[in-house]
A protein has these predicted regions:
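Intracellular effector-coupling site of seven-transmembrane GPCRs
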Residues: 60, 138-139, 168-177, 188-191, ...
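Helix-to-loop junction signature of class
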Residues: 22-26, 36-39, 64-80, 93, ...
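Cytoplasm-facing ends of alpha-helical transmembrane segments in multi-pass membrane proteins
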Residues: 30-41, 59, 66-70, 98-122, ...
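Loop architecture of class A 7-transmembrane GPCRs
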Residues: 1-11, 76-93, 97, 120, ...
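Intrinsically disordered regulatory tails of 7TM GPCRs
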Residues: 1-9, 126, 140, 162, ...
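Hydrophobic alpha-helical transmembrane segments
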Residues: 54-55, 107, 135-140, 182-186, ...
Length: 333
């Protein structure tokens, strides 16, 4: 939308692609992350693991992310018209980026936690870093750093007039793109590239260790468990790379084109469409995180089944719902 001052870029696809995809992300993200929070917070558990702390914070970040989508859905459906005022414009842009970057940073924390557990399971320093206290400290640090990192968005994002229509600039207005450009690169490097390198390095190291242990295992049972762990690690890595990588590459390319060759309307149109098309893909990561959380653990899948059993009231006798846990059955009211 900020390109209308220079080039008549094509924006009709946004009235269909973004509202539909954001609406789907909103519904799925709200349900899945709400379920994850219920399983980790509302159930009375005796103790919290470090992974639960990280995943709870990740679910909160994803939940806040999807809650910022409804104004964007309405605005995109109305052709970028922004009827909500300047304060909500700044707030939506801030929370959109804040929780996107929190998600990447918490995924980096989870990857480091798992890396230490797999590659250095008995090293004293690694064991100390995997405690609940360290997880709480790391989570607080992530929220603080992400808020500080995204705070300039409150200055750059604002409402403005384009073709006699009030819009909410996603990055900043066209006149300030030269000033915004260094900050945009900062977000790409510090906000995305650093967590990306951490996640890829940790999971690649884990896959190497798990592969070597599986190859040297004589018993079928440990080998099968490690193969499952290996497939989980690979799946998480692929989700992270495919969700976050293309979006940030397209966004960075768009920044360079927007600043260096703003008069090349054809090129600008191509890179802007590419950037906008990848936005829904990065949004779907907030739906994938809860699925990976439940899929990667038998105990968590049992928790989810217990919740579904309670919700659907599958009873074998009045007032009793049976939930299979391991090889035994437990009954609850």
């Amino acid at each position: 939308m900020e390109d209308f001052h220079i080039c008549p870029v094509n924006s009709y696809y946004k009235r269909f692609l973004l509202p539909v995809s954001y609406s789907l992300v909103f519904v799925l993200g709200l349900a899945l992350n709400g379920t994850l929070l219920w399983c980790t917070c509302c159930r009375r558990t005796r103790s919290w693991s470090s992974t639960s702390i990280y995943m709870t914070n990740l679910a909160v970040a994803d939940l806040l992310y999807v809650l910022s989508l409804p104004p964007l859905i309405i605005s995109n459906a109305r052709g970028d018209l922004w009827p909500f005022g300047d304060v909500l414009c700044k707030s939506v842009r801030f929370f959109f980026l804040l929780n996107l970057h929190c998600s990447m940073m918490f995924l980096a924390c989870v990857s480091v936690h798992r890396f230490l557990g797999v590659c250095f399971p008995v090293v004293a320093a690694a064991v100390r870093l995997r405690t609940r206290r360290s997880a709480l400290l790391a989570s607080g640090t992530v929220w603080f750093l992400a808020a500080a990192e995204i705070s300039p968005t409150l200055l750059f994002a604002h409402t403005g007039e384009i073709n006699n229509m009030t819009v909410c600039f996603e990055m900043t207005n066209p006149r300030n793109f030269g000033v915004y450009f260094p900050y945009g690169l900062f977000l790409a490097i510090v906000g995305f590239l650093v967590p990306f390198i951490i996640v890829v390095t940790c999971y690649c190291s884990m896959m190497k260790v798990l592969s070597s242990r599986t190859a040297g295992s004589i018993s079928n049972s440990p080998a099968l468990m490690r193969n499952r762990s290996l497939s989980t690690v690979l799946l998480v890595l692929l989700v992270f790379v495919l969700c976050f990588g293309p979006y940030h590459v397209a966004r960075t390319v768009y920044l360079f084109v927007r600043v260096d060759v703003p008069a090349d309307c054809q090129l600008l149109d191509v890179v802007m469409i590419s950037y906008k098309v990848w936005k829904p893909v990065v949004s779907f990561n907030c739906c994938a995180n809860p699925l990976l959380y439940f899929w990667g653990s038998h105990r968590r899948r049992q928790q989810l089944r217990a919740w579904l059993c309670w919700r659907k009231k599958r009873r074998v006798q009045p007032g009793v719902c049976v939930v299979e846990v391991g090889s035994r059955n437990r009954t609850g009211g």
